[in-house]
């Protein structure tokens, strides 16, 4: 997914994002939580937001989050995100510098977390 993100960013003149382990942990934990509790939302059932999840992992500057479910390949999820104005805007935001991706294959829950 990260390579696909960077391909899209290169096409519009944005610098590549780099993987940040804190964003990756937050993304994986959110994908796992969504799969376990069977929901799809940027806010968990207990009210925790993506910004709070990222900061809880120690990342100081959360930027955005993309989520999806039901798509079983990186190409399929990226196609879906790039077909959505809001998700595409996050991916192609040239101010974003870091990324973390999580996926849970039980229902194919995906999370992309972005940071500055």
Predicted regions and their residues:
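A short alpha-helix/helix-coil micro-patch that ends at or immediately precedes a cysteine
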Residues: 1-35
């Amino acid at each position: 997914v990260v390579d696909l993100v960077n391909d899209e960013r290169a096409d519009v003149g944005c610098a590549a994002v780099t993987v940040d382990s804190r964003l990756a942990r937050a993304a994986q934990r959110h994908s796992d939580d969504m799969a376990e509790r069977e929901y799809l939302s940027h806010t968990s059932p207990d009210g925790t937001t993506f910004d709070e999840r990222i900061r809880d992992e120690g990342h100081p500057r959360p930027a955005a989050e993309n989520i999806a479910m039901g798509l079983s390949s990186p190409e399929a999820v990226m196609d879906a995100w790039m077909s959505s104005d809001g998700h595409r805007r996050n991916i192609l935001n040239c101010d974003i510098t870091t990324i973390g991706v999580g996926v849970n294959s039980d229902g194919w829950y995906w999370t992309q977390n972005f940071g500055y």
